Amino acid sequence: MQVNIGFFPQYDHEVGIRTVIKPGFDSSVLRLGQWKILSVKIDGNPKHCYIDPRQGAIGCFEEACRNVVCTGATPMGKVDHLQFGNPEDPEIFWTFMESIEGITDFAKFLNVPCVGG
C-alpha cells in the first residue's frame, strides 16, 4: 500500500496535543478528554472505483473499517465525501448510483450508519 507521506506535513495534526497515534498508515487515534478516544481513517482507491464502482466503494469502506479495527477500535459510523462529475451524463450517473448502492449495502451489512457526507 502506498502512503502519501507528502500530505501529512501540510497540516498540524498535533494541535491541542490530542494525537495518540499519528496519521500515515492505519487509522489515527485522538484523545477526546481523559477517558475517551476516537479512531479516524480516510480512505480511497480511484483505480478500483474506476474499474468497478460498486466494489471499489465497498473496498474503500472496508479498508477504512479494517484500519480502525487495527487500532483496537470498533467502527461506529462513517462520513462520506463523494465526488463525481455531471450527474446528467448517464455514465457518470451510473457510477454514482453503483457507488452509493455498494456503500449502502456494506454499511447495512456492518451495521455502521452514515452520519454525514
Predicted feature residues:
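Glycine/proline-enriched, intrinsically flexible loops and inter-domain linkers
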Residues: 1-117
